[in-house]
């Protein structure tokens, strides 16, 4: 039976302490453009994702939602490769009028860099 690629509640960082653990002790930091991934190992068989995309960094709600959708899609498609990791995506630079294709490309490259770093460790 194939493994589900759904993005369920168990695949999200939900509470402040869960986020704080990743912020306080990231094992890996992977950055690209205005994005940064903070990653640490978790004790669960599946990965968990948290998103921090502030209004100061990405002004329009539609753009914030678009970035979140693209990140969740990449995460959902790569769950098996990311098993056992807690991941937070931060937007650290100001992103004005992001091109949807460029956002997808940046997020794909970011996850590729993360997987390469995980394989080295």
Swiss-Prot record:
Xref: Pfam families: Ribonuclease_P
Keyword Nuclease: yes
Catalytic activity: Endonucleolytic cleavage of RNA, removing 5'-extranucleotides from tRNA precursor
Stored InterPro entries: Ribosomal_Su5_D2-typ_SF, Ribsml_uS5_D2-typ_fold_subgr, RNase_P
Cross-referenced Gene3D superfamilies: 3.30.230.10
UniProt cross-references to SUPFAM superfamilies, sorted A to Z: Ribosomal protein S5 domain 2-like
Enzyme Commission designation: 3.1.26.5
GO biological process: tRNA 5'-leader removal
GO molecular function, one term: ribonuclease P activity
GO cellular component terms given for this protein: ribonuclease P complex
Alphabetically ordered keywords of this record: Endonuclease, Hydrolase, Nuclease, RNA-binding, tRNA processing
Family assignment from sequence similarity: Belongs to the RnpA family.
SUBUNIT field: Consists of a catalytic RNA component (M1 or rnpB) and a protein subunit.
Entry protein name: Ribonuclease P protein component
Organism whose genome encodes this protein: Alcanivorax borkumensis (strain ATCC 700651 / DSM 11573 / NCIMB 13689 / SK2)
Record lineage: Bacteria, Pseudomonadati, Pseudomonadota, Gammaproteobacteria, Oceanospirillales
Gene label: rnpA
């Amino acid at each position: 039976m194939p493994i589900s690629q759904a993005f369920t509640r168990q695949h999200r960082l939900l509470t402040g302490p869960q986020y704080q653990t990743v912020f306080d002790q990231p094992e890996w930091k992977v950055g690209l453009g205005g994005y940064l991934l903070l990653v640490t190992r978790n004790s669960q068989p599946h990965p968990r994702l948290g998103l921090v995309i502030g209004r100061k960094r990405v002004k329009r709600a539609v753009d914030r939602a678009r970035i979140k959708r693209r990140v969740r899609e990449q995460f959902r498609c790569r769950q098996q490769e990311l098993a056992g990791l807690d991941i937070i995506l931060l937007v650290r630079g100001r992103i004005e009028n992001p091109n949807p294709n460029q956002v997808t490309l940046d997020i794909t490259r970011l996850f590729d860099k993360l997987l390469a770093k995980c394989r080295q460790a």
